[in-house]
Amino acid sequence: MASGSNWLSGVNVVLVMAYGSLVFVLLFIFVKRQIMRFAMKSRRGPHVPVGHNAPKDLKEEIDIRLSRVQDIKYEPQLLADDDARLLQLETQGNQSCYNYLYRMKALDAIRTSEIPFHSEGRHPRSLMGKNFRSYLLDLRNTSTPFKGVRKALIDTLLDGYETARYGTGVFGQNEYLRYQEALSELATAVKARIGSSQRHHQSAAKDLTQSPEVSPTTIQVTYLPSSQKSKRAKHFLELKSFKDNYNTLESTL
């Protein structure tokens, strides 16, 4: 009986250790899965690395292109030409509730004005509003090449843009027409100055390409008579003999 009880106690110990190990493994797996779950939920990237098992060159190309995505910013056109909401502006009722449409039209007018504020690469075409404001501030600067543009015109555009995009005041039909008129005037002035500058550069390049006619150079050769040649040779020999005598006398002293 004593040996049987010892055997049963040994079996119980083994079973307890086995069940304890199993419970520990299950708890470890559960905790690990929960940690991975929360880590993936808080992670913004994909659950699997991009380009997994791909060649190194392809993986680098994928990473380079994905890194450019965060720099892509685009301002779409707010109102299309055939937008049904534009018909609401033609109604004779109370148009004050449709002033937001004039705000949208004011921002779209920057795109349709064709002002080349993105031509120098400093103001990309994708960010219309932000770079248009920077362009206006550059025009108002004294060091700008468009100093002839009136500052009052630029101030009108800046105020109209700020009111249409960020302002809380009234921006209705009158404000929009005033803003549109100033925008058209600026576009005309800038295009005229750019056209005159291009014509000036073309004329300067044309002047450089047209080189003046080069007159043929003439070489004049003078031949000495034979008597003068003999005299020059005789004088040279006399001078050489005098130099030799002088060197001999100097060495003897």
UniProtKB/Swiss-Prot annotation:
Main location (coarse class): membrane
Subcellular location: Membrane; Golgi apparatus; Mitochondrion
Keyword field: Golgi apparatus, Membrane, Mitochondrion, Transmembrane, Transmembrane helix
GO BP, sorted A to Z: in utero embryonic development; phagocytosis
Protein purpose: General regulator of phagocytosis. Required to uptake Gram negative bacterium by macrophages.
Membrane-related topology note: Single-pass membrane protein
Gene from which this protein is expressed: C1orf43
This protein's record includes keyword Chaperone: no
UniProt note: domains: N-terminal region is required for phagocytosis of Gram negative bacterium.
A cellular component annotation (GO) from this entry: membrane
Ranges that cross the membrane: 11-31
Claim: Plastid is one of the keywords in the record: no
Protein name according to UniProt: Protein C1orf43
Domain of life: Eukaryota
